[in-house]
Amino acid sequence: MGPEGSNLKFSENGCDFWALENSYYRKGFFVDIGASDGITASNTYLLEKFYKWEGICIDPNPSTLKSMCGARDTIVSDLCVYNESGKILPFKYLGDQSEFYGWNLRSGIDGLVSKDMPVKMNDHKVFTITLTDLLELYNAPNKIDYISIDVEGSEIEVLTGLDFSKYDVKMFSIEYENEENRAKIDWIMSRNNYNRVDFDQQCTEDRYIKNG
């Protein structure tokens, strides 16, 4: 379901409307890490296009960068969010193979991305940046309403690169690859004063809201 009176649907699991409801439908600021082509299953497209949110879309996948730039009016970055800035890392992506629709949007850091892919993936090199450094680079506000993380295995690396004392983030949605990663994510979030809410056992995505 999309904006009132329409059948539009963007976010796969309704994270866009969840973010809207918990921000009382006011204009906000988002960070979309793993934004892919900017539209397909996007947690932030509706926020930007229909509710005038501002934000940053990040994805180092070279096969979706052009589409993301064309689809979004907000800041777009092809840097790779990681736990250390200034590294060059091997990166895997599937690319334009329509017979594997859905899979073709999957990509990630080599060694962290799932190996459960239908075909051999392409190789790429990416430049890394911590989430803190990225937010500083693009002059993000210190108060951020919503961060969406969908990075195919490197969720821990993204979170450990964020200075939680510097940036006051109200909400996170975080996809996880397995239960081991999920437990580590939950530990990081709980020690930084976040509660896990609205999780669905059928989905590999958890939502967090900051206490207070």
Indicate where each model-derived feature is located.
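Phosphate/nucleotide-binding beta-alpha loop and adjacent structural elements of enzyme active sites
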Residues: 1-212
